[in-house]
């Protein structure tokens, strides 16, 4: 970099500084082959674009990483590898793509839009609520598929304490599409070979509502601030009724912790949104 050369900083490529950070070799490149700016890769957050103009009206900024560092510090930017201790992988993906927001699903709660964001590496789902014009987002809670940070990733998996790692895809099923008649969130974990069903409770009128107001004047783009008090995980457990698979077999799962309660306020009425653990299929 010209900036580093002028200041005689040869150690800028040291691993403890910027040496391990993956950056583009094309963006910021000058004619002489040097770079005056660095462009790192995405995967650390998510954005909302208008479908008609492709204008970006919201960006999560650094809130995904910051919230994971606060709520799940031992899983922060971790990477599941069978033979490695879970805590030893903490911060191991910070120089690459961080949490890697990989999958997304949308639900509706009255005039609010609920967005579920699946993060690949830590195996988590961040839940956000938006106003009707999708310009103001608030982090509500984070669900983690890792029920322990003790031992290796492989030991946690064998003990049934690890699910939904590498959330390649998530899908929200409204009541009229759900086999239970209740709102469901379907989550796949490619690393763990699992498919999980979660009951989504507390949604106000959870039917799809395509009348999202996109004509409201857009506010300047900015990252949403981290809530003053971050929701903590509840210690309550629940046992949902078994769900039949397509083969007709009943899949019985273990009890799981619920995520922390999430509160929304509509017309001075408080409603809670929380997961209820559903059943899982057999691991591949």
From Swiss-Prot:
InterPro entries documented for this protein: Choice_anch_I, Mesenchyme-surface_protein
Annotated signal peptide: none
Low complexity bias spans: 223-245
Domain of life assignment: Eukaryota
Tissues/organs with expression: Component of the organic matrix of calcified shell layers.
Biased composition (Polar residues): 258-267
Pfam family, one: choice_anch_I
Composition bias, Basic residues: 246-257, 268-284
Positions of the UniProt region annotated as Disordered: 202-284
Protein name: Gigasin-3a
Species name: Magallana gigas
Taxonomic path: Eukaryota, Metazoa, Spiralia, Lophotrochozoa, Mollusca
